[in-house]
Design a protein with these regions (language model features):
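Conserved, structured core segments of small domains
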Residues: 1-80
Length: 80
């Protein structure tokens, strides 16, 4: 499995829709911890995902959210 950082961004006017998209959507990311700037006014969310490829990583998100998300492949690093 590969590691992905899922970077999602939406306009403040789309915040409610971005969260509502999770209703009735089944994913291991649902209920998982994520980092968000919505409460800080920037409307960005980051998730960690393990998946075989970019498509599989984005499939862990509802379509509305995935369409506004960049899946970035990452690898662990020990800071020197």
């Amino acid at each position: 499995m590969k590691h992905y950082l899922l970077y999602h961004r939406h306009a403040s006017s789309d915040c409610a829709a971005s969260f509502a998209a999770w209703n009735a959507f089944s994913s291991e990311l649902r209920g998982a911890a994520a980092m968000s700037t919505c409460a800080c006014g920037a409307h960005e969310i980051w998730w960690w995902a393990e998946a075989a490829d970019v498509r599989a990583a984005l499939a862990r998100l509802p379509n509305y959210v995935a369409e506004r998300t960049l899946a970035i492949r990452v690898k662990p690093l020990t800071t020197p």
